[in-house]
Amino acid sequence: MTRFVKVGTGGGETTWHRAMLDLRPGDVLLLEPGFYALPQGKMLADVTIKGLGASPEDTRITSFFQVDDASSRIIFENLCLIPYKDSNTLDIPEGVDSFVIFRNCVLRGTGNKTTTLAISGKATVELIATKILNGTVSFFKTADFRLEMADSIIDYVSEEFGTLSLEGHGTAIINNSKITGTLNTFDYCNVELDIHNSFVGNLNMGGKTWLNMYKGQTGQDNSYSLYARGDCWLNIMDSVFPTSLCLADRARVLLHGSDAYSLQLKDDSQITFTNTLVRASANFEDRAKGDANRVTFYGNGDYQYFFYMIGKSRFKGRNLTFKPNGAPMLVGDEAKLAANALYSNEQPLEVECANKNNVSILGIKWTLIKK
């Protein structure tokens, strides 16, 4: 049976410590604005904790919580949660199968390797209009999860730790949200990742990651915007990558209507792209393959070549536009290029190659050059 328990210091209200001692499954705690502390932490099962202030910062709880293995649902609403010392704000351990919702909350992290939300069990986690400040979210190797993030922010940048780390098996759906640091998936994961109309500092993906990205934006403060390796499959539309988009191992990408600073492919990676701009350079190495239609390749002086192929890489293209701005193209080793172009702002286009029979460009004038 649901009990509504009003917590505060006024007449007729239950004190915070009494409410914690008498907490039962099904309880709904209604907290008056104020500061609440529980240094010993608390195991939670099927409870709702809601702040009654005008904003989350009006009702602050300093403590740490763990989800009980008998819990089916926990809700935090309109609260500011602060970890006690160096602890996780919420821990969902192995053996748990639960639903956890944060709605209009602020979670403050420790700013170190201690993650704010630690998920090792089976869980659905919803972040709705929620801010995680100076903290991280980690789904560990044993996790079987579903993450839904809407109108929320995870604000933490570190060269050592991922801002959002996805291991294990599960699905993450990120809508209208912002992740300021790195979103990581790992070599032993199996993850479906959907990013819609959201900002991510950069993406570092491995294992079996299936990415759908629509109207995504990455940051400018990293050496790469997106790095995919392993057996990743990426489907990207109408997105912007201010730094490099890198593929390795057996990664595959479908790229449409997007804008990338540069492309770097190696090993057995492949890209199929249409209606896309490549601002600085496109590099294909080893056995990498590219298939392009209505793509514009620029040179901006940051690289020696605006288009670079070596090893046994392969590229074919249709309706291409070249704007090298003084940079030549390189087709070296056993690499092969076959394309037709609509336009080049420099004619003849300069191509440096090891074997002229490995280059076929129709529609524009081009010439072979030597080093």
Question: PLM features: residue spans?
Answer:
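All-beta strand scaffolds that present successive hydrophobic residues in beta-strands
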Residues: 48-51, 74-78, 97-104, 125-129, ...
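Short, T/G/N/S-enriched strand-turn elements that build extracellular solenoid repeat scaffolds
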Residues: 16-23, 36-44, 60-69, 86-95, ...
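Acidic Gly/Asp/Thr-rich repetitive segments characteristic of extracellular carbohydrate-active
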Residues: 1-32, 37
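Right-handed parallel beta-helix/beta-spiral solenoid domain characteristic of secreted/periplasmic
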Residues: 7-13, 46-91, 109-110
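Extracellular/surface-exposed low-complexity segments
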Residues: 1, 13, 321-322, 339-371
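Beta-rich extracellular carbohydrate-active architectures
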Residues: 36, 54, 61, 76-82, ...
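Long, polar low-complexity repeats
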Residues: 250, 268-269, 277-279, 285-287, ...
